[in-house]
Amino acid sequence: ELLQNSGNPCCDPVTCKPREGEHCISGPCCRNCKFKRAGTVCLDAKGDWMNNYCTGISSDCPRN
């Protein structure tokens, strides 16, 4: 994983964790090393499923 994230500007290549002052490295709720705002759609509705939204405190997309 270290090699995979070595070119990622959000990733500290030594620790493979977010650089100081950054929130995240990747994920559906991460953009430019920061968490997306709460309420940002991270998974569009399909069929009977409703949209899923970012929480503003995680790079993961919570499932409804």
Swiss-Prot record:
Where is it localised? Secreted
Q: Which residues cross the membrane?
A: none
PROSITE patterns linked to this entry? DISINTEGRIN_2 (PS50214)
Motif position, Cell attachment site: 46-48
UniProt KW Disulfide bond keyword:
yes
Entry's InterPro entries?
Disintegrin_dom (IPR001762), Disintegrin_dom_sf (IPR036436)
Query: Which Cys residues form disulphide pairs?
Result: C10-C33, C24-C30, C29-C54, C42-C61
Any Pfam family hit:
Disintegrin
Q: In which tissues is it expressed?
A: Expressed by the venom gland.
Q: Does the keyword Disulfide bond apply?
A: yes
Predominant subcellular localization, coarse grouping: secreted
Q: Annotated Gene Ontology MF terms? A: toxin activity
Which Gene Ontology CC terms are recorded? extracellular region
Write out the similarity annotation: Belongs to the venom metalloproteinase (M12B) family. P-II subfamily. P-IIe sub-subfamily.
Subunit: Heterodimer with VB7A; disulfide-linked.
What role does it play?
Poor inhibitor of platelet aggregation. The disintegrin inhibits the adhesion of cells expressing the RGD-dependent integrin alpha-5/beta-1 (ITGA5/ITGB1) to immobilized fibronectin. Inhibition on alpha-IIb/beta-3 (ITGA2B/ITGB3) is low.
**Which protein are we looking at?**
Disintegrin VB7B
Upper lineage is: Eukaryota, Metazoa, Chordata, Craniata, Vertebrata
